[in-house]
């Protein structure tokens, strides 16, 4: 829907280290178009480090756009799509992203989806995500572990489903499971009791937007 961009969610190793491999692959395959990367301010220093030590021979520029907001903020707009960032509730600075297509004469309907990674339950999300077609929302724990979820700034199955229900989204995708989750049928049923149109994603799954 738009030229490749990278949207960084937060500054932690599991969200960050794969970026170096992505940049190296783009350079190896001769990318020339600028690459726009959005994320927390601190990510700029990491990208400068990469360019200093591994950027020789790169044919494309990395254009870093810092994200810092307390409510939804438009971070990218093209003829096809608007992308907004919004703050999540985690132990460190963390953002989600919403994508809204721009209607055209041939495609007058608006298609939208949103991605909420690491976050505790946050009531404002249902307002910010109102009406999206597809919502990905982390659901690290089953609801019996709501206290642990709150302590670790993550969400439960029921909380993710409540967000989807209150936001009146079309479909909910949950993932980011704790290693404690062994009964995926019970896990998914907890979500479906609140929001029936829900699927629990597995590695390698592909979803049509």
Task: Enumerate the predicted regions with their spans.
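Metal-dependent catalytic neighborhoods of phosphoester/phosphodiester hydrolases
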Residues: 18-25, 182-190
